[in-house]
Curated annotation (Swiss-Prot):
Belongs to the alanine racemase family. This is Alanine racemase. One of its GO terms (cellular component) is cytosol. It comes from Mannheimia succiniciproducens (strain KCTC 0769BP / MBEL55E). It comes from the Bacteria. Pathway: Amino-acid biosynthesis; D-alanine biosynthesis; D-alanine from L-alanine: step 1/1. It catalyses: L-alanine = D-alanine. SMART domains: Ala_racemase_C (SM01005). InterPro entries: Ala_racemase, Ala_racemase/Decarboxylase_C, Ala_racemase_C, Ala_racemase_N, Ala_racemase_pyridoxalP-BS, PLP-binding_barrel. Keywords: Isomerase, Pyridoxal phosphate.
Length: 357
């Protein structure tokens, strides 16, 4: 019997990369492994994929150094850019590339005393309005970076705000702005993340940046299997009790659920202390012994309760799947009103991790 455990499949991870390559056969891949590889384990994911991708994308310098210290030699890109001028010498000696999106960063690079020049990606705001230089500033920043001795190479990066809305023309508007801004300029380009890879073929360009689809999860509320993807993460726990329960009796804090029949209640060893969302409504499914059973009562810190039915054969120690291939995380996300991204990255350190082939 095991407590809450995530099982991470290297086979599924490699399979998903092959699907991504089929979607964008002419693009190089920057695999996004920020936030501990979306909760999958950055060391495991980066080492598994090093020979299958062309580089890695992270949000923070500490994440980049974690990947590098794991023996990975491929380029690493800071997707938010560096936070302090003191970071630049570290980037220089560790083959870490950086986004530049403001004047302070440009000034810091020009002033820095670096052992090796660094590769820079100029972030262009094409409509996300979060990070990036304006379209009118692109020529200025590009020329300044190209003439800076501390810069080895300049690329271009932007980000779609509505790539998961396949009926919106805003993605095409952003793409055309990006293409116009980088026209006749030397440098690789990347604008497509997961949504762009799946739904906007013209956006693939020289590099793509797969994130959530790499982990076998759809960026929209359609099961990833529709795109040939396989979930890399399966969240499981165990039944720690199977109890007879009388009709009319409540279950859990507040007694908000009352059984309408004699039944058997199962107790699963997982709760919001493990990162399972407290706000899941009654009826949210858990997969046990080949069938879905509904959560009843409130999720507590360490346990959830399920209605196993009066004729169940389940026993203590049986595995319960909270999400995975048998129960898509996209479905759990839709029920809870959360994003799949949130569910995966909110799991707490006490959840055990098993890496499987």
């Amino acid at each position: 019997m095991k407590p809450a455990t995530v099982k991470i499949s290297s086979v599924a991870l490699k399979h998903n990369i092959q699907i991504i390559k089929q979607k964008a056969p002419h693009s190089k891949i920057i695999a996004v492994v920020k936030a501990n590889a979306y909760g999958h384990g950055v060391e495991f994911v980066s080492s598994t994929l090093e020979n299958l991708v062309d580089g890695f994308g992270v949000a923070r310098l500490a994440e980049a150094l974690s990947v590098r210290s794991n023996g990975v030699t491929k380029p690493i890109l800071l997707l938010e850019g560096f936070f302090s001028p003191k970071d630049l010498p570290i980037l220089s000696v560790n083959n870490i590339q950086t986004v530049v999106h403001n004047q302070d960063q440009l000034d810091a690079i020009k002033r820095a005393n670096l052992e090796n020049p660094i590769k820079v990606w100029l972030k262009i705001d094409t409509g996300m309005h979060r990070l990036g230089v304006s379209l009118e500033e692109v020529d200025y920043y590009y020329n300044e970076l190209m003439n800076c001795p501390n810069v080895d190479e300049v690329g271009f990066v932007s980000h779609f705000s509505r790539a998961d809305e396949t009926d919106s023309d805003y993605t095409n508007i952003q793409l055309n702005r990006f293409l116009d801004a980088t026209k006749n300029k030397k440098g690789n380009r990347t604008i497509a993340a997961s949504g762009g890879i799946l739904f906007w073929e013209d956006s693939h360009l020289e590099y793509i940046r797969p994130g959530i689809i790499m982990y076998g999860v759809s960026p929209i509320n359609i099961p990833s299997s529709e795109y040939g993807l396989i979930p890399v993460m399966t969240l499981t726990s165990s039944l720690i009790a199977v109890r007879d329960h009388k009709k009319g009796e409540p279950v859990g804090y507040g007694g908000i659920w009352v059984s309408e029949r004699d039944t058997k209640i199962g107790v699963v060893a997982i709760g919001y202390g493990d990162g399972y969302p407290r706000n899941v409504p009654a009826g949210t499914p858990i997969y046990i012994n080949g069938r879905r059973v509904p959560i009843v009562g409130r999720v507590s810190m360490d346990m959830v309760t399920v209605d196993l039915g009066p004729d169940c054969k389940d026993k203590v120690g049986d595995e319960a799947v909270l999400w995975g291939k048998e129960l898509p995380i996209e479905e759990v996300a839709e029920i809870t009103g959360l994003l799949s991204y949130e569910l995966m990255t909110k799991l707490t350190p006490r959840v055990l991790t098993e890496y499987v082939d």
